[in-house]
UniProtKB/Swiss-Prot annotation:
UniProt subcellular location: Nucleus
Protein species of origin: Bos taurus (Bovine)
Pfam families hit by this protein: CENP-B_N, DDE_1, HTH_Tnp_Tc5
PANTHER family per record: TIGGER TRANSPOSABLE ELEMENT-DERIVED PROTEIN 5 (PTHR19303:SF56), TRANSPOSON (PTHR19303)
Family the UniProt entry places it in: Belongs to the tigger transposable element derived protein family.
Domain of life: Eukaryota
Entry protein name: Tigger transposable element-derived protein 5
């Protein structure tokens, strides 16, 4: 057996001695006991650092969604089920139920389905202007009128002045227009080419009550009205029906030159003095197009280096000064269609119109011009009939077109509306202004006046005379020209006709009185019968072929000075004041002509509308008189258009 002995004593730990040459290091002291860490001091007062906190996603609901939730709750569905489907808490749904009257009212203010897509109930700052512009926009889009941003902005400012007065400072900026578009859901689209007029605007809006179409005063149109369908339903309104008429005019013929043989007049006429004038206007007379003057000069000197678009009348060349088919076609597409489209767009009307012409023009310009002494029946027989069917004149979309009232000799002649007194009134007004110019230039001979009165002055006189024709006269002439095509007028309109006719008769008599007075003032030996013959000389005729023709012995007319003379009632001291002044050196004829030509060059550079033809004609007449008295040759500053 083993016996327990004394406990074993562990052997002492040997210390490793450092290698020779290295000192022995002392033993490491025991590690101190760990001391508990003290709390950090509280942070100093100041802005707390941002801490990224994950927030719940916030969704905005449209008015349409809110109304759907309200309708489901009103239908008996539990609010918890509706909240679960829409993902909103119960408090949000109860807020929607509380704001239901406000939501309905907001939809009434915006109108249509556009408001249901809105997420905020925010109206415009100027609600009246916004509502007026939107109603105006819907009304125009119902008629297919294209609208641009600047046009809508200008109309908004006009509404602001009407609502708040002329002192209103409202400005329809681009930002206002953008917000107005977004508020009503209107988009901008670019239009390419000429498209059919749309029936309704692109913006959805409230249903507009359609009123029955009012009967227009134009009835069935002859020949082509039934065969060619209108570009849009509803026919043509009064402002969309136009008429064009052609007439001849001696544009510088004075009463003394038109005196018959044996009456003591010169009776000499010039072929170059005759032009053809095309007049066109709509039924109401509210839109009168620029007169078209057709002459025999291919390049009139007085029209060179001038912008003819600024003249109140247009000029075209024809060998016989008559309207041909190419001229009618060019005028239709270059002047009539653009002018009518601008007027219809400005008047907020549908882009369609019809032009009534008495008969188609000659296919060529070789028609014999009837003599003045021939009867009316002979004149009509001399007018050649078209060799082929008349050309279809209309725009590619068919919105603007031409209808001929008479196509041939076998059909009944339908008088054009403008032939019922409007053309005669235009000629009387033109000749009155021509006589006024002749009287104002009474210091020289009639030949000086005829040389100084150029084709450019004639265009201004033609435009002025056409502007003086009243719109009521044009409207009344339609009842005489196409009486069977109009529907019966109401009693109140028929009762008002005599007053208008009496006013027109008074205006006609006043023009005739002015003509007689001016003729008596300018010509001493002229009888009233000769003035009447001069007025009606170019009603239906042209000139015989052969250029210049003498109808009797020539005699220069006697012109009574009636221009810038001093009245006889003035005292002699005033009339003879110039003699008492100190005499100065008299300029020579060359110096006077050079000064007058310098003044003419300056005057022609001014605005023609402010200067007018009177001053130019007077100055040219003075130049011709000075050259004639000084024995100087013709002036290059006074070109001759008609002689």
């Amino acid at each position: 057996m083993y016996s327990a002995g004394p406990p074993a004593v562990p052997a002492p730990r040997r210390c490793r001695r450092p290698p020779p040459g290295r000192p022995m290091q002392p033993p490491r002291p025991p590690a101190p006991a760990p001391v508990p860490a003290a709390r950090p001091p509280p942070p100093a007062p100041g802005p707390r650092p941002r801490v990224a906190v994950k927030m719940a996603f916030r969704k905005a609901y449209s008015i349409k969604d809110k109304l759907q939730a309200i309708e489901r709750v009103k239908g008996g569905e539990r609010q918890a089920s509706v909240c679960r489907d829409f993902g909103v808490p119960g408090g949000t749904l109860r807020g929607w139920l509380k704001d239901e009257p406000k939501l309905r009212w907001f939809l009434e203010q915006l109108g249509g389905e556009v408001g249901t897509q809105r997420k905020k109930m925010r109206l415009a700052n100027e609600e009246e202007i916004d509502r007026a512009v939107y109603s105006w926009f819907l009304a125009l889009r119902q008629h297919g009128v294209p609208l641009s941003g600047p046009l809508i902005q200008a109309q908004a400012e006009a509404f602001a002045r009407q609502i708040y007065g002329p002192e209103c400072t409202f400005k329809a900026s681009h930002g206002w227009f953008w917000r107005w578009q977004k508020r009503h859901g209107i988009s901008s689209q670019r239009i390419y080419g000429e498209a059919e007029p749309v029936a309704a605007g692109p913006a959805p809006g409230p249903p507009v009550k359609q009123e029955p179409a009012q009967p227009t005063r134009a009835g069935p149109l002859p020949d082509r009205a039934a065969s060619t369908p209108a570009p849009a339903e509803g026919g043509y309104g009064d402002e969309q029906i136009y008429n064009a008429n052609v007439t001849g005019l001696y544009w510088k013929l004075l009463p003394e030159q038109a005196a018959p043989v044996g009456a003591g007049g010169c009776g000499r006429r010039w072929r170059g003095d005759r032009v053809t004038v095309l007049l066109a206007a709509n039924l109401t007379g509210s839109h009168k197009l620029k007169p078209l003057v057709i002459g025999q000069l291919p390049d009139p000197p007085s029209l060179r280096h001038h912008n003819q678009d600024k003249f109140p009348a247009s000029y075209r060349y024809s060998p016989d000064a008559w309207l041909s088919r190419p001229l009618l076609r060019g005028w239709f597409f270059e002047e009539f269609v653009p002018g009518v489209r601008r007027y219809l767009r400005r008047s907020c009307l549908q882009q369609k119109a019809v032009l009534l012409v008495a008969h188609p023009p000659c296919p060529s310009s070789e028609a014999r011009m009837p003599a003045l002494e021939e009867s009316e029946e002979t004149r009509r027989r001399c007018r050649p009939e078209p060799t082929g069917p008349p050309e279809e004149l209309q725009t590619p979309d068919g919105a603007v077109r031409v209808l001929f009232l008479c196509r041939g000799s076998g059909r009944a002649h339908i008088p054009a509306p403008l032939e019922q007194g409007v053309v005669a009134a235009f000629k009387q007004l033109y000749k009155r202004e021509l006589l006024r110019l002749a009287v104002s230039c009474a210091g020289g001979s009639p030949l000086d006046f005829m040389r100084s009165f150029m084709l450019k002055d004639m265009l201004y006189l033609a435009g002025l005379s056409w502007d003086l024709v009243q719109a009521g006269s044009i409207e009344r002439c339609w009842l005489l020209g196409l009486r069977a095509a109009f529907e019966p007028r109401p009693v109140e309109e028929r009762a008002g006709q005599p007053a208008g006719q009496a006013e027109e008769a008074a205006e006609h008599s006043r023009v005739l009185s002015d003509l007689t007075h001016l003729a008596a003032l300018a010509y001493k030996r002229l009888a009233p019968e000769e003035v009447a013959e001069w007025l009606h000389l170019d009603d239906d005729g042209g000139l015989p072929d052969g250029g210049r023709e003498d109808w009797g012995p020539s005699r220069p007319p006697v012109l009574v000075p009636g221009g810038p003379l001093l009245p006889a009632s003035l005292p002699s001291a005033v009339a003879g004041g110039a003699e008492e002044e100190e005499e100065e050196a008299i300029p020579t004829a060359g110096e006077a002509v050079r000064g007058l030509e310098t003044a003419l060059r300056w005057l022609e550079t001014q605005d023609p509308r402010e200067v007018g033809p009177l001053k130019l004609v007077q100055l040219r007449s003075l130049i011709s008189t000075a050259r004639r008295l000084g024995g100087i040759g013709p002036s290059p500053m006074v070109p001759d258009d008609g002689l």
